[in-house]
Amino acid sequence: MDHGLEIATLGGGCFWCLEAVFQQVDGVRAVESGYTGGHVSHPTYRQVCEGDTDHAEVVRLTFDPATITFREILEIFFSIHDPTQLNRQGNDVGTQYRSIIFTHSEAQRAVAEYVIGELVANKVYDAPIVTQVEPEQPYWRAEMSHQNYYQEHPAQGYCAFVISPKLAKFRRDYSHRMRR
């Protein structure tokens, strides 16, 4: 990894949704879909979807904190998924879709807890936030068919009806954070 870059690992529903948004964020150098938080080494998509591994679908971001801070990444993260839904996002149901932040340092943990505290204090959501904050765990890259999914399949039904609206919301609310 390049000197000065940091890693963020986030789960908030299907990793295709998060991947598509964060690929457009200025300062995010790389986005990779994968699995973490479970007890099986090298899990497959099928195993994770069957719910037998306890893994979450996540994106692992490599970002330049001089361009975008971890806090700003979390602000985008909380705007593109519903952190009040336990083990689901919309019609995607299961523990693999849980809202979770895997932190890579004590500083990230503190920022994550602070941002969640602000959201609660400001009553941004009507229901309790269920986002978990946990230290990083072994991470496994998802299969190639899950990398760059939206870019490869923009007309696919899930992409058109679930991911495209999230991208539109991101572009509307965070145009200043988009890559130029």
Regions found by a protein language model. Name each.
Residues 1-180:
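Flexible coil/turn and secondary-structure edge motifs
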